[in-house]
């Protein structure tokens, strides 16, 4: 038999890794302390992979030569501590996938905000250019499973900090770091520098022929960039500074320069609206340019890209009140971007599982734009403390229907109801998609 690998966690990442490892001759065992979803259970059964659920066989796990840890499992998990203590190597799913990617190219996108939109736009640009590629990682299929079942010459991967935590050799040909803001601090011992280090790992194995695209206007990125030894070709993007390389926006026009290549287009032609999306669009355009995709194709893709569900998604306008679903806003910075783009009086639906939020970041915008806050969470004390003196109306709700009805009650014609929770969703919902879908359903029932 091949190398003994244990896969911790039987979700999308874990099952994808198990299928790839089995295909490549590993002796595979999947362990999940919760129960598996039916589709993942049958995937493992069909592939002839041994697994356990609802319990953990410590002896068998600690007999592994290598462990693949799913990104949702924190370091403070008891079993993870035991694996570390025994000195067994822990890798992430993207590390396993990378071993078997062959000659394929990887464009990897990470960042606290904007990574999903940038990844989806990048994929759209590549498809528009006729490239045979797959969307993998946090969005779409697990990277490992894609390689096992339908390998492609190009992968566009959305990568979280959790996936970067356990890489060893993973190296994207093009890495994009959209920005770094305080997020997931609960997973990084409430130490922001640990989280920052994780994000920069996207570039740590890159070589001079690779490209690293980052935001030169992002304070944290710029403060830390020189602490990490980045060998790749650096391509910054900015709205504040004219750059000789990378991309910048000036007087409503975007200019992209990568080596000899030069492109410009009006930001008014961007399908994605809002300042934050101008950064996302610049990053994807720079990446496309380094891949020698024709300017016309990049321009076309940027103009006809459809936005993503749960990201500033218009739901309906009812009696002159506009409803927007931004359920993907799981941190304060995302909500800052959403509020920043509001031009009408706003009823803000806020709350959920707080990941160490600093609400002072949105205090000024709330003062300026928000007429009422509807809390949608099991524990809303921090929201009341942060905004009790600023907003006259703050109401607690514990389900999407009540939140929507309350927001409609406090709204008048010409207002916007914005679901942009700044928190994770798992106190009351399965995930942010479930929260967004329940919000949309409640709006349709008004």
Regions found by a protein language model. Give the residues of each.
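Short internal beta-strands
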Residues: 27-33, 212-216, 349-350, 369-378
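N-terminal leader/targeting and accessory segments in enzymes
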Residues: 1-92, 96, 385
């Amino acid at each position: 038999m091949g190398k003994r690998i244990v896969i911790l966690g039987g979700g999308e990442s874990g099952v994808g890794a198990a299928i790839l490892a089995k295909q490549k001759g590993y002796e595979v065992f999947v362990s999940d302390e919760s129960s598996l979803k039916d589709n993942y259970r049958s995937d493992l059964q069909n592939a002839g992979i041994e697994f356990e659920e609802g319990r953990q066989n410590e002896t068998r796990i600690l007999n592994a030569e290598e462990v693949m840890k799913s990104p949702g499992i924190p370091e403070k998990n008891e079993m993870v501590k035991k694996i570390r203590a025994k000195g067994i190597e822990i890798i992430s799913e993207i590390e396993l996938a990378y071993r078997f990617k062959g000659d394929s190219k990887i464009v990897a996108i990470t960042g606290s905000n904007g990574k999903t939109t940038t990844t989806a736009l990048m994929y759209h640009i590549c498809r528009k250019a006729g490239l045979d590629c797959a969307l993998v990682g946090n969005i779409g299929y697990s990277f490992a499973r894609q390689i096992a079942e339908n390998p492609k010459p190009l992968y566009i991967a959305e990568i979280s900090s959790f996936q970067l935590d356990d890489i060893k050799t993973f190296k994207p040909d093009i890495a994009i770091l959209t920005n770094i803001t305080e997020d997931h601090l609960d997973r990084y011992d409430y130490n922001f520098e640990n989280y920052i280090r994780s994000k920069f790992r996207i570039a740590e194995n890159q070589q001079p022929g690779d490209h690293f695209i980052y935001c030169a206007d992002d304070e944290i990125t710029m403060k830390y960039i020189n602490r990490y030894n980045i060998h790749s070709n650096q391509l910054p993007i900015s709205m504040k500074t004219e750059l000789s390389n990378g991309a910048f926006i000036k007087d409503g026009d975007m200019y992209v320069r990568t080596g000899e290549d030069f492109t410009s287009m009006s930001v008014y032609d961007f399908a994605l609206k809002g300042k934050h999306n101008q950064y996302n669009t610049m990053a994807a355009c720079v990446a496309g340019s380094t891949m020698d995709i024709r300017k016309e194709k990049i321009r076309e893709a940027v103009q006809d890209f459809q936005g993503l569900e749960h990201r500033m998604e218009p739901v309906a306008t009812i009696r002159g009140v506009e409803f927007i679903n931004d359920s993907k806003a799981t941190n304060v910075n995302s909500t800052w971007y959403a509020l920043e783009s509001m031009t009408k009086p706003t009823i803000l639906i806020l709350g959920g599982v707080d990941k160490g939020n600093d609400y002072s970041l949105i205090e000024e915008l709330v003062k300026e734009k928000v007429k009422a806050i509807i809390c949608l969470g099991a524990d809303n004390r921090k929201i009341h403390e942060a905004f009790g003196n600023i907003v006259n109306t703050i109401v607690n709700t514990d389900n999407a229907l009540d939140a929507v009805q309350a927001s409609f009650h406090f709204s008048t014609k010409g207002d916007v109801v914005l679901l942009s929770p700044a928190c994770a969703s798992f106190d009351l919902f399965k995930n942010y998609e479930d929260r967004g879908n329940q919000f949309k359903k409640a709006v349709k029932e008004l």
